[in-house]
């Protein structure tokens, strides 16, 4: 587990630099690294009663991919948290986090449907431009896996 800290503090910067270094070390050893680019669990909009949407993806993953010239395997996780979780997500971050643990425990031992895309090798990824363009490209690749 490589922690990513979204706070705007010196400690967060140190944590994120170290996590990026470790990710690059793992990739150099051909050890796969799984990254959730939004850094958050998807949440239903409209106070928990709308469509489930990802938080905006950060360019952190794109930076690591570009530095390592890594191959990417897009993965889409199907699943749905409870309505209670989605409503709480709009009320209180501590409540959301507490319920996230509950949601994980609720699914313990259950089968989760996962779609795994074809590997996208560095030469194809390099054509996507800068970090933002690469992030947008990868987002679309993952979302394409969600389609029936």
Where on the chain are the PLM-derived regions?
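Membrane-interfacial amphipathic helices and adjacent loop/beta segments
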Residues: 1-18
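Non-catalytic C-terminal accessory region of glycerolipid acyltransferases
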Residues: 13, 17-148
